[in-house]
């Protein structure tokens, strides 16, 4: 496959495209106008476009299917150049605010949930993506292309703020080289200009890779998919815990460079009769003592044939209240897109079933 122009930072394109100002124009077409082909680049000489087309492609993704939730969540299934498919989610976090005179006082806020791999190696017991196994890493361009495609499809101007969470298909830190390149591309001032502070890397806990990410000093946030407070249950839910146990993860988090004004996010997927009891809440308080942490409780999002169940709302609230009363900042994540195939891997699985 040819590489995409989305695989490169501006300085790299400038080194390969002469005169260099043309590279900057092309960068504008990619990230300000969301060009899908060389033909879209109206002020670029045809000879240069023909030359570039011999070595590069522009668009890497084809929308196979998308589903719109009542809450504004949009789930996308994309086909890659090699025919593999990935999922990306457009999340509406806050509605637009309008005053009595009809003036916008606050723009709507959006987050894009991005995939980093086709499939996943981690094999979490509760995750539908894990059923399909691992196929390959995404390139940096394929990671970047998801954000470009969603901003284009939702008419979201390049200079409007957006947050990125690497919480889609795959383990981000298992594809760290391509992930870090994508992060740097997003940060480009002449591109989308999405700072590290607006990018969150979610990991199931590759403790050695947490250290390496910290050494890269990319300025991103991390979120730890903890989901259990003892190694026995966590190994059941996340088999990789045998190699990267809870203790090693906590120590890696303590070493990670964190903005003193920020907190480390710990994600805790709550599953009925597994980890929703107050005994688990008590252990969680002890586990996170000494860490400037925020706990995000997440309702398990059921899918067909899963043995796990969604917890009761009353149990979620009791769990949250216990953590708050014992000094932890704790939120319950709104269940986005519950009326559509919003759990990771669901839309892909559903579409494949329909085609059979």
UniProtKB/Swiss-Prot annotation:
HAMAP family: RNA_methyltr_RlmN (MF_01849). GO terms for molecular function: 4 iron, 4 sulfur cluster binding; metal ion binding; rRNA (adenine(2503)-C2-)-methyltransferase activity; rRNA binding; tRNA (adenine(37)-C2)-methyltransferase activity; tRNA binding. InterPro entries: Aldolase_TIM (IPR013785), Elp3/MiaA/NifB-like_rSAM (IPR006638), Methyltransferase_A (IPR040072), RlmN_N (IPR048641), RNA_MTrfase_RlmN (IPR027492), rRNA_lsu_MTrfase_RlmN/Cfr (IPR004383), rSAM (IPR007197). Its cofactor is [4Fe-4S] cluster. This is Dual-specificity RNA methyltransferase RlmN. It comes from Sulfurimonas denitrificans (strain ATCC 33889 / DSM 1251). The active site is at 87 (proton acceptor), 344 (s-methylcysteine intermediate). Keywords: 4Fe-4S, Cytoplasm, Disulfide bond, Iron, Iron-sulfur, Metal-binding, Methyltransferase, rRNA processing, S-adenosyl-L-methionine, Transferase, tRNA processing. Reaction proceeds by a ping-pong mechanism involving intermediate methylation of a conserved cysteine residue. Specifically methylates position 2 of adenine 2503 in 23S rRNA and position 2 of adenine 37 in tRNAs. m2A2503 modification seems to play a crucial role in the proofreading step occurring at the peptidyl transferase center and thus would serve to optimize ribosomal fidelity. [4Fe-4S] cluster binds at residues 120, 124, 127. One of its GO terms (cellular component) is cytoplasm. One of its GO terms (biological process) is rRNA base methylation. It holds the Pfam family RlmN_N. S-adenosyl-L-methionine binds at residues 170-171, 202, 225-227, 301. It is an enzyme of class 2 (transferase). The keyword NADP does not apply. Residues 106-339 form the Radical SAM core domain. PROSITE patterns: RADICAL_SAM. Disulfide bonds join 113-344. It is found in: Cytoplasm. Belongs to the radical SAM superfamily. RlmN family.
């Amino acid at each position: 496959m040819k590489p995409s122009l989305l695989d490169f930072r501006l300085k790299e394109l400038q080194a390969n495209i002469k005169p260099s100002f043309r590279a900057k124009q092309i960068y504008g077409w990619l990230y300000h106008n969301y060009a899908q082909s060389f033909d879209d680049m109206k002020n670029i000489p045809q000879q240069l476009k023909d030359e570039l087309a011999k070595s590069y492609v522009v668009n890497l993704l084809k929308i196979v299917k998308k589903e719109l939730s009542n809450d504004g969540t949009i789930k996308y299934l994309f086909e890659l150049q090699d025919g593999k498919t990935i999922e990306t989610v457009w999340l509406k976090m806050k509605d637009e605010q309008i005053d009595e005179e009809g003036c916008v006082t606050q723009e709507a806020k959006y987050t894009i949930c991005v995939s980093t791999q086709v499939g996943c190696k981690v094999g979490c017991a509760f995750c539908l993506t894990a059923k399909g196994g691992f196929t390959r890493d995404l390139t940096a361009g394929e990671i970047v292309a998801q954000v470009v495609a969603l901003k284009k499809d939702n008419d979201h101007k390049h200079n409007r703020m957006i947050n990125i969470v690497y919480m889609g298909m795959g383990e981000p830190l298992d594809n760290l080289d391509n992930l870090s390149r994508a992060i740097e591309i997003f940060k480009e001032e002449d591109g989308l200009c999405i700072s590290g502070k607006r990018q969150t890397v979610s990991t199931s806990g590759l403790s050695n890779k947490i250290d390496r990410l910290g050494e890269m000093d990319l300025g991103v946030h991390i979120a730890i998919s903890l989901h259990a407070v003892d190694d026995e249950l966590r190994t059941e839910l996340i088999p990789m815990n045998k190699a990267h146990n809870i203790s090693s993860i906590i120590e890696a988090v303590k070493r990670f460079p964190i903005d003193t004004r920020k907190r480390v996010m710990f994600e805790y997927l709550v599953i009925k009769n597994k980890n929703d009891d107050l005994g688990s809440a008590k252990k969680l308080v002890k586990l996170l003592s000494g860490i400037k942490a925020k706990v995000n409780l997440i309702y398990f999002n059921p899918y067909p044939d899963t043995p796990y169940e969604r917890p009761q709302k009353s149990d979620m609230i009791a769990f949250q209240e216990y953590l708050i009363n014992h000094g932890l900042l704790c939120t319950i994540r709104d269940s986005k897109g519950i009326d559509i195939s919003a759990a990771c891997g669901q839309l892909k699985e559903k579409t494949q079933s329909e085609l059979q």
